[in-house]
Amino acid sequence: MLSSLLITQFIYGTISTIIYSLTVVFLTKNWKHFDNYFLKLYICQFFFNMWMYWNFYITSRLPASTCKDCYLSGWFDSLSKDSGSMFPFKFFIFCQYHLGFMSYSNLFLTSINRFTLIFMPKRYFQIWHYGTYILIALIFITPILFTYPLLVHQAYLEYNPLSDTYVARTQADLPFLYSFILVWMVVTVLLSIIANIICWFKISKYSKAARQQSDYRLFLVSFVTFVINCGVFSIAMLNKISADIDPSKLLLSSRIAQLLSPFANDLLSLSTPYVLIIFSKRIRQSIKNLFIKGTVAPSSITPLQNIPASRI
């Protein structure tokens, strides 16, 4: 049972994945011209954003669109609680929650990256030369302190006869995990708000010429991505509140949050390349050349430090 929603999400998800991949290909092929730690974080973010987006199809979207007589029902029945399947379904459940932690951690890390560039430009390269991969490793490892029960306990799919679809279940203590995710989201978002507000006050005093420079444009990329993350966070919080006080979804705000919820995580995972393309004329032109010429000649790219400010 392929719903129109699932088809729509698959189409824009595939298109966004291609565009996201093209930006990464361009940055990788011309790495020496864009040797910037912000862009390294961008490429790292690409991997776990894509992982999170397509992983969600296995844990939620496909099961929620499959009826008892549908093509995938046989596979999903084999993932039931008592089936004894060898398919590592609990690993995909683990990834879904683990990557949720990582998304908000990366939001904070990107905000700190811009903060150090704006307020500590002389020490920026020293800090991120030694700290980039250490911080990325911490983002990846730290959530395991909270998400490891998902790897220990069984996860399975359960058929719901009322909706005629399948639902993912786990024997791990999800309320306990949700409480940690909520605290993690609140703390990282609040710290990101503080960092971005301080940066905004500083950068708003830049001259018109300075606002054409790369650090200003990359700050805008970070800031817009931060605003998008705040929007997704607001939807998540509204869903949590409505689940507690309005489980029947009688209030308009509850219904709006429920309607937006399927697209919120997609916005979190897929918006980054569009923001970068909007604010980077260089990358925008290079993506265009990839479609028209099929490649980007390295000689056509000027090293970042030699690019006129208006062309970055």
From Swiss-Prot:
Keywords from UniProt, A to Z, are: Membrane, Transmembrane, Transmembrane helix
Tell me the CDD domains matching this sequence.
7tm_classA_rhodopsin-like (cd00637)
Gene3D superfamilies listed in its UniProt record: Rhodopsin 7-helix transmembrane proteins (1.20.1070.10)
Query: Which GO-annotated molecular functions does the record name?
Result: transmembrane signaling receptor activity
- What is the first-listed, main subcellular location in coarse terms? membrane
Q: GO:BP terms for this protein?
A: sensory perception of chemical stimulus
InterPro entries reported for this sequence: 7TM_GPCR_serpentine_rcpt_Srg
Question: Is this entry keyworded Transmembrane?
Answer: yes
**Residues that span the membrane, as ranges:** 6-26, 38-58, 92-112, 132-152, 180-200, 218-238, 259-279
Q: Name one GO cellular component term.
A: membrane
Any Pfam family from its record, for instance, is Srg
Provide the topology term for how it sits in the membrane.
Answer: Multi-pass membrane protein
> Where does this polypeptide localize?
Membrane
Annotated family = Belongs to the nematode receptor-like protein srg family.
Instruction: Supply the name of the protein.
Output: Serpentine receptor class gamma-31
